[in-house]
């Protein structure tokens, strides 16, 4: 159904002729190696391209060690907004390379295990589940899922996992709105209404 429906239009995406900028390709390619784009943070610039911080530890993702060494709390906030995932989705759609889908699925699965939704776990991290972090994740996911939906690896089981996680995140946002009158609250409300 989700692969063949044509009556739903999202003005934020172009499935027919997706474009992939060199910057987006760089973000997507580095994510394959657990080097994640985090807005306003980069390890260095090499050959005119930003090189992002590596979260790889022995072939697995270490979400905490690097984040714990950064003096700026905004690094940790931005990390949990998953800003590299839209670029991976566009790269998949533009190239058909299943490595982007596989990387996204493994990374998102790993993240969900490391940071269980507060509805399911006591003592969940307020940085991960508060403020703009869940709102940006849900907003971006609604925009990038259509790019991945045609992957042969996007099984009904995985779709159910992602849709349930998205619904749970939306409910977590709704139950924990930021203070009245803030831009964060406005963003949260917009995401909940759209989701």
Give, region by region, the residue ranges found by the protein language model.
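Extreme N-terminal leader/anchor segments
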Residues: 1-53
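Aromatic-lined, polymer-binding surfaces characteristic
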Residues: 55, 59-61, 65-195
